[in-house]
Regions:
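Conserved core of the sugar-phosphate nucleotidyltransferase
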Residues: 102-156
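Short beta-strand segments
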Residues: 9, 94-96, 122-125
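Residues at the starts of beta-strands that form the adenosine-phosphate
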Residues: 3, 43-46, 118
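Short glycine-enriched, charge-decorated loop/helix-capping segments at active-site entrances
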Residues: 20-25, 63-64
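A short, N-terminal amphipathic alpha-helix
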Residues: 29-47, 56-59
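Short phosphate-binding loop-to-helix
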Residues: 52-95, 99-109
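N-terminal nucleotide-binding beta1-loop-alpha1 segment
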Residues: 1-18
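Conserved sequence signature across two-component system core domains
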Residues: 8, 48-50
Length: 156
């Protein structure tokens, strides 16, 4: 049986913006906004963090804490999965903790993609020169990602 969980990595010690997960957005911490939208999907949703301040917002039932210095959110998700914490799930959706504009519709698009592919990524056609914005270099013939980067892509 297929069982899917949403994992939201949320690192306190970000090199670009320390404490970003708890930044207040209209009276609610950003990470809580992301979490609340993800739970609208009906899927079990968990926050993965390195810091007690974030852990205390959710508690042990909805949050996994590991102070290992992972390089990125994907590594944090892999660490939690490898640890066995999520043994009852066999599919995972990694939603970035700094994506307060995520919608349940995006989650459903990912679920639909996972019915066909082992890995799926949602991206928007939105050229950006912002080094904080991750860009996807994709193969237009196969509609697959070749790489992800924060640097400017040549065709922009």
């Amino acid at each position: 049986m297929i069982s899917t969980a949403i994992l939201i990595p949320a690192r306190w010690g970000s090199t670009r913006y320390e404490g970003k997960p708890l930044v207040d957005l209209d009276g609610k911490p950003m990470i809580k906004r992301v979490f609340d939208e993800c739970t609208k999907s009906g899927l079990d949703t968990f926050v993965l963090t390195d810091d007690m301040r974030i852990f205390e917002l959710f508690g042990s039932g909805q949050c996994w804490i590991d102070e290992t210095p992972y390089n990125n959110g994907t590594e944090r998700c892999a660490g939690a999965i490898d640890n066995g914490f999520f043994h009852k799930y066999n599919r995972f959706i990694n939603v970035q903790g700094d994506m307060p504009d995520v919608t349940v519709d995006v989650i459903y698009m990912i679920l639909k993609g996972l019915n066909t592919y082992d890995v799926t990524t949602v991206c928007a056609k939105n050229p950006s020169r912002d080094p904080n914005c991750v860009k996807v270099d994709r193969d237009v013939k196969t509609n697959t990602a070749k790489s992800f980067t924060r640097t400017l892509l040549l065709d922009e």
